[in-house]
Amino acid sequence: MKSWSTRPLPQLPGNIEAPQLFDSASKTLRALPVAADASLYVCGITPYDATHMGHAATYLAFDLLGRVWRDSGASVNYVQNVTDIDDPLLERADRDGVDWRELAESQIELFRADMTALNVIAPQQYIGAIEAIQWIVPAVEELIAEGFAYRMDSGDVYFDTVAASVKTPDSSNAGELGAWWLGQISGLSPEEMLPVFAERGGDPERDGKRNPLDPLLWRVERAGEPAWPGASLGDGRPGWHIECTVIARKFLPAPFSVQGGGSDLLFPHHEMGDGHAWALDHTPLAKHYAHAGMVGLDGEKMSKSRGNLVLVSALRAEGVDPMAVRLSILANHYRSDWSWTAELLERSKLRLAQWRAAMEHTSVGSAAQLVSEIRTALAADLDAPTALNAVDNWVGQKATTEHSALDAALASDAIEALLGVVL
Protein backbone atom coordinates (compact mmCIF):
# COMPACT_ATOMS: atom_id res chain seq x y z
CA MET A 1 0.00 0.00 0.00
CA LYS A 2 1.38 3.43 -0.91
CA SER A 3 1.92 6.00 1.83
CA TRP A 4 2.16 9.71 0.99
CA SER A 5 4.66 12.26 -0.26
CA THR A 6 7.24 13.82 2.06
CA ARG A 7 9.03 17.15 1.72
CA PRO A 8 12.83 16.99 1.62
CA LEU A 9 14.15 17.55 5.15
CA PRO A 10 16.38 20.63 5.57
CA GLN A 11 19.87 19.82 6.81
CA LEU A 12 21.07 21.71 9.88
CA PRO A 13 24.58 22.26 11.23
CA GLY A 14 25.35 20.12 14.28
CA ASN A 15 23.15 17.47 15.87
CA ILE A 16 20.72 17.04 18.73
CA GLU A 17 22.25 15.29 21.73
CA ALA A 18 21.00 12.70 24.24
CA PRO A 19 17.26 12.70 23.55
CA GLN A 20 15.01 11.28 26.27
CA LEU A 21 11.51 9.84 25.92
CA PHE A 22 8.98 8.75 28.52
CA ASP A 23 8.52 4.97 28.56
CA SER A 24 4.96 3.92 29.36
CA ALA A 25 5.99 0.43 30.47
CA SER A 26 8.53 1.48 33.10
CA LYS A 27 6.78 4.81 33.82
CA THR A 28 10.14 6.57 33.61
CA LEU A 29 11.95 9.02 31.37
CA ARG A 30 14.55 6.98 29.51
CA ALA A 31 17.40 7.88 27.20
CA LEU A 32 16.99 6.95 23.57
CA PRO A 33 20.27 5.51 22.33
CA VAL A 34 21.62 7.60 19.48
CA ALA A 35 22.47 4.87 17.00
CA ALA A 36 22.94 4.70 13.27
CA ASP A 37 19.61 2.93 12.88
CA ALA A 38 16.37 3.58 14.74
CA SER A 39 13.10 1.73 14.26
CA LEU A 40 9.58 2.96 14.91
CA TYR A 41 6.15 1.37 14.66
CA VAL A 42 3.04 3.51 15.07
CA CYS A 43 -0.39 1.91 14.96
CA GLY A 44 -2.46 3.31 12.12
CA ILE A 45 -6.09 4.16 11.52
CA THR A 46 -9.17 2.05 11.08
CA PRO A 47 -10.40 3.89 7.98
CA TYR A 48 -13.96 4.95 8.59
CA ASP A 49 -13.66 8.55 9.93
CA ALA A 50 -10.24 9.99 9.09
CA THR A 51 -8.51 12.19 10.18
CA HIS A 52 -9.81 13.62 13.44
CA MET A 53 -7.66 15.75 15.71
CA GLY A 54 -6.88 12.82 18.01
CA HIS A 55 -5.40 10.94 15.06
CA ALA A 56 -3.44 13.99 13.98
CA ALA A 57 -2.01 14.58 17.47
CA THR A 58 -0.71 11.01 17.67
CA TYR A 59 0.97 11.07 14.27
CA LEU A 60 2.48 14.50 14.91
CA ALA A 61 3.92 13.27 18.22
CA PHE A 62 5.82 10.48 16.52
CA ASP A 63 6.67 12.71 13.59
CA LEU A 64 8.55 14.83 16.15
CA LEU A 65 10.35 11.71 17.37
CA GLY A 66 11.36 10.86 13.82
CA ARG A 67 12.66 14.39 13.31
CA VAL A 68 14.67 14.25 16.54
CA TRP A 69 16.19 10.93 15.54
CA ARG A 70 17.09 12.19 12.08
CA ASP A 71 18.65 15.32 13.56
CA SER A 72 20.80 13.07 15.76
CA GLY A 73 22.15 11.48 12.58
CA ALA A 74 20.13 8.27 12.73
CA SER A 75 18.44 6.55 9.83
CA VAL A 76 14.82 5.86 10.80
CA ASN A 77 12.93 2.77 9.66
CA TYR A 78 9.29 3.73 10.23
CA VAL A 79 6.38 1.32 9.78
CA GLN A 80 2.69 2.10 10.10
CA ASN A 81 -0.29 -0.18 9.55
CA VAL A 82 -3.86 0.38 8.40
CA THR A 83 -6.60 -1.75 9.96
CA ASP A 84 -8.46 -2.00 6.67
CA ILE A 85 -10.72 -4.83 7.84
CA ASP A 86 -12.39 -4.72 11.26
CA ASP A 87 -15.85 -4.69 12.81
CA PRO A 88 -16.16 -0.88 13.12
CA LEU A 89 -15.39 -0.45 9.41
CA LEU A 90 -17.98 -3.06 8.42
CA GLU A 91 -20.57 -1.57 10.77
CA ARG A 92 -20.05 1.95 9.39
CA ALA A 93 -20.27 0.73 5.80
CA ASP A 94 -23.48 -1.15 6.60
CA ARG A 95 -24.94 1.90 8.35
CA ASP A 96 -24.16 4.18 5.41
CA GLY A 97 -25.13 1.65 2.73
CA VAL A 98 -21.73 1.69 1.03
CA ASP A 99 -19.26 -1.01 0.10
CA TRP A 100 -16.72 -1.42 2.92
CA ARG A 101 -13.84 -1.51 0.43
CA GLU A 102 -14.85 1.82 -1.09
CA LEU A 103 -15.27 3.37 2.35
CA ALA A 104 -11.84 2.17 3.44
CA GLU A 105 -10.08 3.38 0.30
CA SER A 106 -11.73 6.80 0.40
CA GLN A 107 -10.77 7.31 4.05
CA ILE A 108 -7.21 6.06 3.51
CA GLU A 109 -6.80 8.50 0.63
CA LEU A 110 -8.18 11.30 2.80
CA PHE A 111 -5.74 10.36 5.56
CA ARG A 112 -2.84 10.48 3.10
CA ALA A 113 -3.90 13.97 1.99
CA ASP A 114 -4.18 15.15 5.60
CA MET A 115 -0.74 13.79 6.52
CA THR A 116 0.79 15.46 3.47
CA ALA A 117 -0.88 18.77 4.36
CA LEU A 118 0.33 18.55 7.97
CA ASN A 119 3.89 17.80 6.77
CA VAL A 120 4.11 14.44 8.55
CA ILE A 121 7.06 12.37 7.36
CA ALA A 122 5.71 9.25 5.64
CA PRO A 123 6.52 5.73 6.85
CA GLN A 124 8.83 3.62 4.72
CA GLN A 125 6.32 0.78 5.00
CA TYR A 126 2.55 1.43 5.04
CA ILE A 127 0.88 -1.95 5.39
CA GLY A 128 -2.79 -2.90 5.41
CA ALA A 129 -4.14 -5.71 7.57
CA ILE A 130 -5.52 -7.44 4.48
CA GLU A 131 -2.09 -7.35 2.87
CA ALA A 132 -0.63 -8.91 6.04
CA ILE A 133 -3.02 -11.89 6.24
CA GLN A 134 -0.51 -13.99 4.28
CA TRP A 135 1.94 -13.58 7.21
CA ILE A 136 -0.65 -13.63 10.01
CA VAL A 137 -2.05 -17.08 9.21
CA PRO A 138 1.23 -18.98 9.75
CA ALA A 139 1.90 -16.96 12.91
CA VAL A 140 -1.45 -18.00 14.40
CA GLU A 141 -0.82 -21.60 13.35
CA GLU A 142 2.52 -21.44 15.16
CA LEU A 143 0.89 -20.10 18.33
CA ILE A 144 -1.56 -23.02 18.28
CA ALA A 145 1.25 -25.52 17.74
CA GLU A 146 3.25 -24.07 20.65
CA GLY A 147 0.29 -24.20 23.03
CA PHE A 148 -0.20 -20.43 23.24
CA ALA A 149 -3.49 -20.36 21.33
CA TYR A 150 -6.63 -22.49 21.18
CA ARG A 151 -9.70 -23.04 19.04
CA MET A 152 -13.22 -22.44 20.23
CA ASP A 153 -16.04 -24.79 19.21
CA SER A 154 -17.01 -22.14 16.64
CA GLY A 155 -13.56 -22.32 15.05
CA ASP A 156 -12.45 -18.91 16.30
CA VAL A 157 -8.88 -18.88 17.64
CA TYR A 158 -7.87 -17.10 20.86
CA PHE A 159 -4.52 -16.27 22.47
CA ASP A 160 -4.06 -17.99 25.84
CA THR A 161 -2.80 -15.20 28.09
CA VAL A 162 -2.21 -17.53 31.04
CA ALA A 163 -0.15 -20.02 29.04
CA ALA A 164 1.91 -17.20 27.52
CA SER A 165 2.58 -15.35 30.80
CA VAL A 166 6.03 -16.04 32.23
CA LYS A 167 6.91 -13.68 35.05
CA THR A 168 10.52 -13.67 36.16
CA PRO A 169 11.86 -11.81 39.23
CA ASP A 170 14.26 -9.49 37.41
CA SER A 171 12.62 -9.15 33.98
CA SER A 172 11.61 -5.53 34.60
CA ASN A 173 14.87 -4.27 36.08
CA ALA A 174 15.84 -0.78 34.91
CA GLY A 175 12.83 -0.64 32.66
CA GLU A 176 14.14 -3.40 30.41
CA LEU A 177 11.48 -5.76 29.08
CA GLY A 178 12.01 -9.47 29.49
CA ALA A 179 9.68 -12.45 29.56
CA TRP A 180 6.07 -11.38 29.06
CA TRP A 181 3.21 -11.47 31.51
CA LEU A 182 -0.20 -9.83 31.42
CA GLY A 183 0.18 -6.37 32.94
CA GLN A 184 3.86 -5.94 32.14
CA ILE A 185 3.29 -3.07 29.69
CA SER A 186 0.18 -1.41 31.14
CA GLY A 187 0.82 -1.94 34.84
CA LEU A 188 -2.88 -2.77 35.28
CA SER A 189 -4.21 -5.54 37.49
CA PRO A 190 -6.56 -8.13 35.96
CA GLU A 191 -9.45 -6.49 37.80
CA GLU A 192 -8.58 -3.13 36.25
CA MET A 193 -8.13 -4.69 32.83
CA LEU A 194 -11.57 -6.28 32.50
CA PRO A 195 -13.70 -3.15 31.93
CA VAL A 196 -11.04 -1.59 29.70
CA PHE A 197 -10.78 -4.79 27.66
CA ALA A 198 -14.55 -4.82 27.15
CA GLU A 199 -14.59 -1.14 26.17
CA ARG A 200 -11.74 -1.50 23.67
CA GLY A 201 -12.84 -4.37 21.48
CA GLY A 202 -12.43 -7.33 23.82
CA ASP A 203 -15.04 -9.92 24.75
CA PRO A 204 -14.35 -10.94 28.37
CA GLU A 205 -17.79 -12.50 28.86
CA ARG A 206 -17.73 -14.80 25.82
CA ASP A 207 -18.57 -18.37 26.79
CA GLY A 208 -15.95 -21.02 26.09
CA LYS A 209 -12.84 -18.88 26.50
CA ARG A 210 -10.17 -20.21 28.82
CA ASN A 211 -9.56 -16.78 30.34
CA PRO A 212 -11.75 -13.65 30.17
CA LEU A 213 -8.83 -11.49 28.95
CA ASP A 214 -7.79 -13.78 26.09
CA PRO A 215 -7.87 -11.79 22.81
CA LEU A 216 -9.08 -12.98 19.42
CA LEU A 217 -6.43 -14.12 16.94
CA TRP A 218 -8.59 -15.43 14.07
CA ARG A 219 -12.32 -15.01 13.44
CA VAL A 220 -13.73 -17.72 11.21
CA GLU A 221 -16.04 -16.75 8.39
CA ARG A 222 -19.57 -15.58 9.20
CA ALA A 223 -22.41 -15.23 6.74
CA GLY A 224 -22.35 -11.85 5.06
CA GLU A 225 -18.83 -10.98 6.24
CA PRO A 226 -15.66 -10.83 4.13
CA ALA A 227 -13.19 -13.65 4.65
CA TRP A 228 -9.77 -14.74 3.38
CA PRO A 229 -8.07 -18.12 3.06
CA GLY A 230 -6.73 -19.22 6.44
CA ALA A 231 -5.13 -22.58 5.60
CA SER A 232 -5.66 -24.86 8.62
CA LEU A 233 -7.47 -22.05 10.45
CA GLY A 234 -10.30 -22.01 7.95
CA ASP A 235 -11.42 -18.99 5.97
CA GLY A 236 -11.83 -15.87 8.08
CA ARG A 237 -10.03 -12.70 9.14
CA PRO A 238 -7.46 -11.76 11.78
CA GLY A 239 -7.94 -10.27 15.20
CA TRP A 240 -6.70 -6.76 15.84
CA HIS A 241 -3.59 -7.21 18.00
CA ILE A 242 -1.89 -9.96 16.00
CA GLU A 243 -1.95 -7.77 12.87
CA CYS A 244 0.46 -5.20 14.28
CA THR A 245 2.74 -7.79 15.87
CA VAL A 246 3.18 -9.67 12.61
CA ILE A 247 3.66 -6.53 10.51
CA ALA A 248 6.27 -5.20 12.94
CA ARG A 249 8.09 -8.52 12.96
CA LYS A 250 8.08 -8.59 9.16
CA PHE A 251 9.62 -5.17 8.61
CA LEU A 252 11.49 -4.20 11.80
CA PRO A 253 14.20 -5.75 13.98
CA ALA A 254 13.25 -7.74 17.07
CA PRO A 255 12.92 -5.89 19.35
CA PHE A 256 12.54 -2.57 17.55
CA SER A 257 13.30 0.81 19.12
CA VAL A 258 9.93 2.42 19.89
CA GLN A 259 6.29 1.30 19.75
CA GLY A 260 4.06 4.35 19.53
CA GLY A 261 0.37 5.13 19.56
CA GLY A 262 -2.37 6.89 21.45
CA SER A 263 -2.69 6.24 25.18
CA ASP A 264 -5.87 4.26 24.53
CA LEU A 265 -3.70 1.61 22.83
CA LEU A 266 -1.55 0.89 25.89
CA PHE A 267 -4.06 -1.75 26.95
CA PRO A 268 -5.10 -4.05 25.48
CA HIS A 269 -3.49 -3.44 22.10
CA HIS A 270 0.17 -2.97 22.96
CA GLU A 271 0.00 -5.30 25.96
CA MET A 272 -1.34 -8.13 23.82
CA GLY A 273 0.92 -7.33 20.88
CA ASP A 274 3.97 -7.74 23.08
CA GLY A 275 2.56 -11.01 24.39
CA HIS A 276 2.10 -12.33 20.86
CA ALA A 277 5.69 -11.39 20.01
CA TRP A 278 7.10 -13.10 23.10
CA ALA A 279 5.08 -16.25 22.47
CA LEU A 280 6.25 -16.40 18.85
CA ASP A 281 10.00 -15.99 19.37
CA HIS A 282 10.70 -15.20 23.05
CA THR A 283 11.78 -11.67 22.20
CA PRO A 284 10.02 -8.48 23.33
CA LEU A 285 8.17 -6.62 20.62
CA ALA A 286 9.79 -3.24 21.37
CA LYS A 287 12.40 -1.75 23.67
CA HIS A 288 10.38 1.35 24.48
CA TYR A 289 6.65 2.17 24.59
CA ALA A 290 5.50 5.75 24.08
CA HIS A 291 1.95 7.07 24.04
CA ALA A 292 0.26 10.31 23.06
CA GLY A 293 -2.51 11.82 25.15
CA MET A 294 -6.17 12.04 24.23
CA VAL A 295 -7.72 15.05 22.52
CA GLY A 296 -11.14 16.30 23.56
CA LEU A 297 -13.74 18.76 22.38
CA ASP A 298 -15.62 20.79 24.97
CA GLY A 299 -14.23 18.66 27.77
CA GLU A 300 -15.01 15.22 26.30
CA LYS A 301 -12.60 12.80 24.61
CA MET A 302 -12.81 13.16 20.83
CA SER A 303 -13.82 9.82 19.32
CA LYS A 304 -15.64 8.30 16.39
CA SER A 305 -18.16 6.59 18.65
CA ARG A 306 -19.14 9.87 20.31
CA GLY A 307 -19.27 11.69 16.99
CA ASN A 308 -17.61 14.80 18.43
CA LEU A 309 -14.90 14.99 15.81
CA VAL A 310 -12.90 17.90 14.48
CA LEU A 311 -11.62 16.68 11.12
CA VAL A 312 -8.40 17.94 9.58
CA SER A 313 -9.98 17.66 6.13
CA ALA A 314 -12.91 19.86 7.20
CA LEU A 315 -10.54 22.55 8.47
CA ARG A 316 -8.59 22.38 5.23
CA ALA A 317 -11.81 22.69 3.25
CA GLU A 318 -12.58 25.85 5.23
CA GLY A 319 -9.26 27.30 4.08
CA VAL A 320 -7.38 26.90 7.38
CA ASP A 321 -3.62 26.78 6.86
CA PRO A 322 -2.48 23.25 7.83
CA MET A 323 0.56 24.77 9.54
CA ALA A 324 -1.79 26.58 11.93
CA VAL A 325 -3.40 23.22 12.70
CA ARG A 326 0.04 21.72 13.28
CA LEU A 327 0.98 24.56 15.63
CA SER A 328 -2.27 24.09 17.55
CA ILE A 329 -1.35 20.47 18.21
CA LEU A 330 2.28 21.23 19.06
CA ALA A 331 1.16 23.83 21.61
CA ASN A 332 0.26 20.86 23.84
CA HIS A 333 2.78 18.37 25.19
CA TYR A 334 2.33 15.09 23.35
CA ARG A 335 1.64 13.11 26.55
CA SER A 336 -0.99 15.52 27.88
CA ASP A 337 -4.74 15.22 27.47
CA TRP A 338 -6.13 18.44 26.02
CA SER A 339 -9.12 19.95 24.28
CA TRP A 340 -9.45 21.48 20.85
CA THR A 341 -10.97 24.96 20.88
CA ALA A 342 -11.58 27.68 18.33
CA GLU A 343 -9.45 30.00 20.49
CA LEU A 344 -6.49 27.63 20.28
CA LEU A 345 -6.68 27.67 16.49
CA GLU A 346 -6.92 31.47 16.37
CA ARG A 347 -3.83 31.82 18.60
CA SER A 348 -1.97 29.44 16.31
CA LYS A 349 -2.94 31.43 13.22
CA LEU A 350 -1.55 34.56 14.86
CA ARG A 351 1.62 32.76 15.95
CA LEU A 352 2.18 31.47 12.41
CA ALA A 353 1.75 34.95 10.93
CA GLN A 354 4.21 36.41 13.44
CA TRP A 355 6.80 33.73 12.73
CA ARG A 356 6.55 34.30 9.01
CA ALA A 357 6.81 38.05 9.36
CA ALA A 358 9.91 37.71 11.55
CA MET A 359 11.81 36.12 8.68
CA GLU A 360 11.99 39.56 7.08
CA HIS A 361 13.92 41.22 9.94
CA THR A 362 16.42 38.76 11.39
CA SER A 363 19.55 39.90 13.22
CA VAL A 364 22.97 38.63 12.24
CA GLY A 365 24.04 35.68 14.40
CA SER A 366 20.68 35.24 16.13
CA ALA A 367 19.58 31.92 14.65
CA ALA A 368 22.22 29.59 16.12
CA GLN A 369 20.93 30.09 19.66
CA LEU A 370 17.38 29.43 18.49
CA VAL A 371 18.40 26.13 16.91
CA SER A 372 20.09 25.13 20.17
CA GLU A 373 17.02 25.98 22.25
CA ILE A 374 14.65 24.04 19.99
CA ARG A 375 16.94 21.01 20.14
CA THR A 376 17.21 21.20 23.93
CA ALA A 377 13.44 21.32 24.30
CA LEU A 378 12.75 18.42 21.95
CA ALA A 379 15.49 16.29 23.50
CA ALA A 380 13.58 16.54 26.79
CA ASP A 381 10.68 14.18 26.02
CA LEU A 382 9.63 15.99 22.83
CA ASP A 383 8.73 19.19 24.69
CA ALA A 384 7.17 21.02 21.75
CA PRO A 385 5.45 23.76 23.83
CA THR A 386 8.84 24.88 25.17
CA ALA A 387 10.28 24.76 21.66
CA LEU A 388 7.41 26.92 20.38
CA ASN A 389 8.00 29.40 23.19
CA ALA A 390 11.68 29.58 22.20
CA VAL A 391 10.65 30.59 18.69
CA ASP A 392 8.17 33.13 20.10
CA ASN A 393 10.93 34.70 22.19
CA TRP A 394 13.25 34.81 19.20
CA VAL A 395 10.52 36.37 17.05
CA GLY A 396 9.83 38.96 19.76
CA GLN A 397 13.40 40.23 19.82
CA LYS A 398 13.94 43.50 18.01
CA ALA A 399 16.48 43.30 15.22
CA THR A 400 19.79 44.82 16.35
CA THR A 401 21.55 44.62 13.00
CA GLU A 402 20.65 44.77 9.36
CA HIS A 403 18.52 41.86 8.15
CA SER A 404 20.47 38.62 7.79
CA ALA A 405 19.11 36.37 5.06
CA LEU A 406 21.44 33.60 6.26
CA ASP A 407 20.04 33.68 9.78
CA ALA A 408 16.49 33.84 8.48
CA ALA A 409 17.18 30.78 6.33
CA LEU A 410 18.74 28.87 9.24
CA ALA A 411 15.84 29.71 11.54
CA SER A 412 13.29 28.73 8.91
CA ASP A 413 15.12 25.47 8.17
CA ALA A 414 15.32 24.61 11.88
CA ILE A 415 11.63 25.29 12.44
CA GLU A 416 10.80 23.02 9.51
CA ALA A 417 13.35 20.27 10.16
CA LEU A 418 12.70 19.98 13.89
CA LEU A 419 9.10 21.13 14.34
CA GLY A 420 7.75 20.34 10.88
CA VAL A 421 6.32 23.84 10.46
CA VAL A 422 6.81 25.27 6.97
CA LEU A 423 7.11 29.07 6.95
Curated annotation (Swiss-Prot):
Query: What name does this protein carry?
Result: L-cysteine:1D-myo-inositol 2-amino-2-deoxy-alpha-D-glucopyranoside ligase
Write down the species: Renibacterium salmoninarum (strain ATCC 33209 / DSM 20767 / JCM 11484 / NBRC 15589 / NCIMB 2235)
Cited InterPro entries = Cys-tRNA/MSH_ligase (IPR024909), Mycothiol_ligase_MshC (IPR017812), Rossmann-like_a/b/a_fold (IPR014729), tRNA-synt_1_cat_dom (IPR032678)
| Catalytic activity line of the entry | 1D-myo-inositol 2-amino-2-deoxy-alpha-D-glucopyranoside + L-cysteine + ATP = 1D-myo-inositol 2-(L-cysteinylamino)-2-deoxy-alpha-D-glucopyranoside + AMP + diphosphate + H(+)
Task: Please name the GO terms of the biological process aspect recorded for this protein, alphabetically.
Answer: cysteinyl-tRNA aminoacylation; mycothiol biosynthetic process
- Superkingdom, natural source: Bacteria
Q: Which Pfam families match?
A: tRNA-synt_1e
HAMAP family registered for this protein in UniProt: MshC (MF_01697)
Q: Where is this motif: 'ERGGDP' region?
A: 199-204
